[in-house]
Amino acid sequence: VAKCTEESGGKYFVFCCYKPTRICYMNEQKCESTCIGK
């Protein structure tokens, strides 16, 4: 599964990337339910 990073408050967090739109989900549970190719 592709990953992406997003900056928040000067800190970097890793989120799921939902293909093919590569949207960063801030909610980890949402990542788990939406990521393709887990």
From Swiss-Prot:
- Tissue distribution of the protein: Expressed in flowers but not in leaves, seeds or roots (at protein level).
Has UniProt tagged this entry with the keyword Zinc?
no
Asked whether the UniProt record includes Transcription among its keywords, one would answer no
The protein's role, per its UniProt record: Antimicrobial peptide. Active against fungal species B.cinerea (IC(50)=5.8 uM) and A.niger (IC(50)=5.6 uM) but not against F.oxysporum, F.graminearum, B.sorokinina and P.debaryanum at concentrations below 10 uM. Active against bacterial species P.syringae, B.subtilis and X.campestris.
The record's Gene Ontology biological-process terms are: defense response to fungus; defense response to Gram-negative bacterium; defense response to Gram-positive bacterium; killing of cells of another organism
**Which keywords does the record carry?**
Antibiotic, Antimicrobial, Disulfide bond, Fungicide
Name of the featured protein: Antimicrobial peptide 1
State the signal peptide span: none
* Entry comment on modification after translation: Disulfide bonds.
